[in-house]
From Swiss-Prot:
Pfam families: Dus. InterPro entries: Aldolase_TIM, DUS-like_FMN-bd, DUS_fam, DusB, DusB-like, tRNA-dHydroUridine_Synthase_C, tRNA_hU_synthase_CS. Its EC number is 1.3.1.-. It catalyses: a 5,6-dihydrouridine in tRNA + NAD(+) = a uridine in tRNA + NADH + H(+); a 5,6-dihydrouridine in tRNA + NADP(+) = a uridine in tRNA + NADPH + H(+). The active site is at residue 100. FMN binds at residues 16-18, 70, 139, 200-202, 224-225. PROSITE patterns: UPF0034 (PS01136). Gene3D superfamilies: Aldolase class I, Putative flavin oxidoreducatase, domain 2. Its cofactor is FMN. The keyword Protein transport does not apply. This is tRNA-dihydrouridine synthase B. HAMAP family: DusB_subfam. It is an enzyme of class 1 (oxidoreductase).
Length: 334
């Protein structure tokens, strides 16, 4: 799929997720087969640009793949300024957030709350597109409530404003992440515009990915929560799309390598004083399958030192490997 002059290596995109899709996670998703990874949301409010959190989020240079940066806000001038400063910092695509359903974002009339105001949407899109010389994309939901699905109207407006690709999450703002995503609206949007359409929502495995592409006619898929603790999902899906065959489960040793490598990158990126806190949620996601009783995760979350985290993970996987060998030995002797 092409967005402006950028050719993606495949049709799988890692979704922007606040507090998750930082540089270490984006780099890992890219290595695991994502055709593009979009940055976590950056506020257009200039008052927060100088904070440590924003400073780290605005590091875009020397990153693998196409550097797509998402911005959020409701003031057209602020959004234009945010787009310019991120392009100056290395962004190659600007993505506009009109899909976030979080209350703290919607209270500021940002995210999916904007879908109620098409005129303001139009002003924001024009301002950002005119402000930068890189492609601008848009992420939305199907509407702000089940009885107010206006994604086709917004999609047509976006195309008229110069938006070069549109991502649609298959729920309304009111739905949050409850219930199942629906794809009829995404299919209707695909049939109503000529710009690339990216389907998002509940794409959790290779079979679902194939089904959503076939049903909606979308040009690409955006995967978010399903990649938490499982960044290799991009490789799994791409292999299935290419061959019709499923990859075998990732070996435990490879899970260990990826997890510990990810945690080391988090420690390095945020500093050991903060990195160990960021690492906790990622470890919890990685180990959902291997530590279902939560005992190790509770123990891990009490650790307040980066090096101790790595030691605990090494010991955990060593113990898990021994248990697996004993189980296999007992099975062979039966």
């Amino acid at each position: 799929m092409r967005i402006g002059h950028h050719q993606l290596t495949n049709c799988l995109i890692a979704a922007p997720m606040a507090g998750i899709t930082d540089r270490p996670f984006r780099t890992l998703c890219h290595a695991m087969g994502a055709g593009m990874a979009v940055s976590e949301m950056l506020s257009s409010n200039p008052e927060v640009w100088r904070t440590d959190k924003s400073r780290l989020r605005m590091v875009h240079s020397d990153e693998p793949g196409i550097r797509s940066v998402q911005i959020a806000g409701c003031d057209p001038d602020d959004m234009a300024a945010a787009a310019r400063i991120n392009v100056a910092s290395g962004a190659q695509l600007i993505d506009i957030n009109m899909g976030c359903p979080a209350k703290k974002v919607n209270r500021k009339l940002a995210g999916s709350a904007l879908l109620q105001y098409p005129d303001l949407v139009k002003r924001i899109l024009h301002a950002v597109v005119d402000a930068v010389d890189v492609p601008v994309t848009l992420k939305i939901r199907t509407g702000w409530a089940p009885e107010h699905r206006n994604c086709v109207e917004i999609a047509q407006l976006a195309e008229d404003c110069g938006i070069q690709a549109l991502t649609i999450h298959g729920r309304t703002r009111a739905c949050l992440f409850n219930g199942d995503a629906e794809y009829d609206s995404i299919r209707a949007v695909k049939q109503s515009v000529s710009i690339p359409i990216i389907a998002n929502g509940d794409i959790t495995d290779p079979h679902k990915a194939r089904a959503v592409l076939d049903y909606t006619g979308a040009d690409a898929l955006m995967i978010g929560r399903a990649a938490q603790g499982r960044p290799w999902i991009f490789r799994e899906i791409q292999h299935y799309l290419d061959t019709g065959e499923l990859l075998p489960p990732l070996p435990l040793g490879e899970v260990k390598r990826l997890l510990i490598g990810h945690i080391r990158e988090l420690h390095g990126f945020y500093g050991q004083g903060k990195g160990f806190r960021i690492a906790r949620k990622h470890v919890s996601w990685y180990l959902q399958e291997h530590a279902p009783n939560d005992q190790f995760r509770r123990t891990f979350n009490a650790i307040e030192d980066a090096s101790e985290q790595l030691e605990a993970l090494e010991a955990y996987f060593e113990n898990l490997s021994v248990k697996k060998e004993l189980t296999e030995l007992c099975s062979n002797n039966e």
